[in-house]
A protein has these predicted regions:
Chain B
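Bacterial N-terminal signal peptides that target proteins for export
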Residues: 1-6
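Extracytoplasmic copper-binding redox domains, predominantly the cupredoxin/blue-copper superfamily
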Residues: 10, 15, 19-105
Length: 177, 105
């Protein structure tokens, strides 16, 4: 191999690494265009302190491939749709017969995490969440660029034994399949 | 008349809800105390953060999902048990902090 081709190969390799690092970030996670068709809701989490209900979804393809106790498959996308809870005339959340908050149709924010092979390589070990990346969207589905994702990484790092998820991995374990 | 008064009193007693109990759970030394709790529907659990660090009350168990937010040292939060079932409370910050709650009628 000539010096020129060696140089080109090295430059290409360096360029690829640099590109990977440069593109790491929330913009890699897009709002799923076919969210209503392609996702399934698997849990709800009441947030009485925020007067909100979090509806938690996973894309159907990942749900079909996932197995209890195993890391989620590549291509998994988890979405949390945070909706305002129904309130009484004093502004306090109403509850249903089981004591659960009642979600309205009003979306407050949308949280997303997506797993793609190699996405985590750009992050240092003390931050990396496997191959997960995060993004936050406004109710109109555009990215909320004011939100820093460091909080997502640090909080989800506490659930490394569940593939960095708070609900899905545990829910599959509880289900046993 | 005596019969009707007695009948009314009996009906009132029957309609009155059973007294709800409050259970206190300490968050201390990066653990919940106790780690298992049995309660009735309508009872409450008061979580008291006796540690010098933030804790949380988070339930991922399907059908019981709730997140009471970050709880600072000395702060208290209350969880009302609205339905039967078994669920696990965990601290968002400390993955080994677990409390199993079994709620019956």
């Amino acid at each position: 191999m000539s010096r020129l081709s060696l140089g080109l190969a090295a430059a290409t390799a360096i360029g690829s690494i640099a590109a990977g690092i440069a593109f790491a970030g929330p913009e890699r996670v897009k709002y799923p265009e076919k969210f209503r068709q392609d996702f399934v809701m698997f849990n709800t989490v009441d947030r009485p302190d925020l007067k909100a209900v979090r509806l938690v979804f996973i894309n159907k393809a990942a749900d079909a491939e996932a197995k209890a106790g195993q890391p989620l498959p590549e291509g998994s996308i988890l979405i949390v749709e945070q909706r305002k809870a129904k309130l009484d005339d004093k502004g306090e959340p109403l509850r249903d017969a089981a004591g659960r908050l009642i979600p309205t149709d009003e979306i407050m924010t949308i949280l997303a995490m997506e797993k793609r092979k190699g996405w985590g390589e750009a992050y240092p070990a003390d931050k990396r969440n496997g191959d997960w990346e995060y993004n936050v969207f406004k109710p109109d589905r555009t990215p909320n660029v004011a939100v820093k994702m460091d909080g997502c990484f640090s909080c989800h790092l506490n659930r490394a034994d569940r593939d960095f998820t708070f609900t899905y991995f545990k829910n599959r374990q509880d289900r046993g399949n | 008349m005596r019969v009707s008064i007695l009948a009314a009193a009996t009906a009132a007693l029957a309609a009155a809800p059973a007294c709800a109990a409050e259970h206190v759970v300490l968050m201390e030394n990066i653990a919940y105390a106790p780690t298992e709790l049995r309660a009735k529907v309508g009872d409450t659990i008061r979580f008291v953060n006796a540690d010098g660090t933030n804790h949380a009350v988070f339930v991922a168990t399907r059908g019981h999902g709730v997140d009471l937010g970050m709880q600072k040292p000395k702060a208290e939060t209350v969880l009302t048990l609205g339905k039967e079932g078994r669920f696990e409370v965990e601290c968002v910050n400390h993955p080994n902090m677990r409390l199993v709650v079994v709620v019956t009628k």
